Amino acid sequence: MQNPSPPGTPTPADSAVTAAATEAAQAFIQRWHGVAASELATSQSFVIELCALLGVEPPTHEPHYQFERPITFQHGDGSTSAGRVDCYRRGHFVWESKKLKPGAQAQRSGTTTKAFDDALLKARQQAENYARALPASEGRPPFVVVVDVGHVIELYAEFTRSGATYTPFPDPRSHRIRLAQLADPAIRARLQALWTDPLSLDPSRISAKVTRAVAAELAELAKSLEAAGHRPEPVAAFLTRCLFSMFAEDVGLLPTAGT
């Protein structure tokens, strides 16, 4: 009789799905790497094909999720002007696409020029202006996405949705996703969450979830120790040490491996 596989061991079906996803990601990367067409000709196709890669619904013709969403800017002098969001999903994101020219050397080395970075910063400011111009009834989306088609995707988040500044997500060092990084399942999962549940990426919610899980584990540990005959006072002292140790690890007070 064949021994059962340990829990968590991938099944042949799981492996096949993973292989298919990896193959699809590599095909997407190859398809879009260094694409030279104009912004208008490529931005919508890029979004549609990215949606297919991530397994999410592409934009529709409905105003809550569409390409070229009309926006009206209200100016201080009472005048108005019109704009259009490249791609908009209510409660999820404002998406601004560009087609810049990072240069051949930048493409090879993965570096970018100041002019390229400045252009993306300008695109970010444009996207934030769109987010602030949305009707109050719709609220502001938690994410602003800035894309240089065929090169990078930048994520900026403002989870309070109160009009505060959108900041690099998850941090200034890794908010820029290069096209080749779409081969990473974790990166694809992050992008997928923009469509399915953007607020699930809120660090405060993740921390609260972890805190609740830890509290539940410690409560069960306390019950088991007391059930085993340990007095409440030593149990409480032990759990306090556990909490302090976790805190010390989180803030870097404990030495890491090899130090």
Give the label of every model feature segment:
Residues 57-91:
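Active-site metal-binding core of divalent-cation-utilizing nuclease and nuclease-like domains
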Residues 65, 71, 164-165, 170, ...:
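Residue-level signature of transmembrane alpha-helix interfaces in integral membrane proteins
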Residues 29-69:
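Acidic-basic catalytic patches of nuclease active cores, encompassing PD-(D/E)XK
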Residues 54-60, 248-259:
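Short helix-capping/linker segments at secondary-structure and domain boundaries
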